[in-house]
């Protein structure tokens, strides 16, 4: 499936709250880290970091943009205002990418757990 045109292969988010969306997002990566014995990470980040080829860089940029847009849409669907959903999605993806590097180095999901707690604090009070 083409990440650039359809990032929904990540699966539909079952959450109906903003906190649930972020927890779901963290859990996707937690499962990947655990399944790899702490050695996994984001393949797109690996390509982006090592890409000397402009075409690969463009593809990685498109994948990250698609994931950010999907996460923002899911946050908006739970009531997060559009002007907050995009930035929160961007911070979430950026934090997750850094956490994945740390998980690999530490061979632990603890960096993901820290990110999960701190991401929840970014959410606006929707009550």
What is each model feature region?
Residues 11-12, 30-34, 43-53, 74:
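Helix-loop "lid/cap" segments that line or gate small-molecule binding pockets
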Residues 53-54, 64-88, 125-127:
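Hydrophobic alpha-helical bundle segments that form small-molecule/ligand-binding pockets
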Residues 19-22, 26, 41-45, 57, ...:
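A general structural signal for well-ordered alpha-helical segments in protein cores
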Residues 1-3, 14, 18, 22-25, ...:
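Hydrophobic/aromatic residues within well-ordered alpha-helical segments
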Residues 14, 18, 56, 81-85, ...:
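Residue-level recognition of alpha-helical structural elements
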Residues 7-40, 89-92:
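Hydrophobic alpha-helical connector segments
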Residues 40, 45, 83-102, 118-122:
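Hydrophobic alpha-helical segments that form the core
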Residues 6-11, 33, 55, 75, ...:
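Short amphipathic alpha-helical interaction patches enriched in hydrophobic/aromatic residues
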């Amino acid at each position: 499936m083409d990440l650039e045109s359809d990032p929904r292969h990540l699966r539909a988010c079952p959450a109906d709250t903003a906190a649930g969306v972020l927890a779901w997002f963290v859990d996707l990566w937690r499962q990947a880290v655990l399944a790899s014995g702490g050695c996994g990470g984001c393949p797109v980040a690996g390509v982006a970091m090592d890409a000397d080829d402009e075409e690969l860089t463009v593809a990685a940029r498109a994948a990250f943009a698609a994931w950010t847009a999907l996460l923002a849409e899911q946050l908006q669907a739970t009531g997060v205002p559009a002007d907050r959903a995009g930035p929160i999605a961007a911070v979430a993806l950026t934090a997750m990418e850094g956490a994945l590097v740390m998980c690999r180095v530490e061979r632990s999901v603890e960096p993901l757990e820290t990110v999960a707690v701190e991401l929840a604090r970014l959410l606006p009070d929707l009550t």
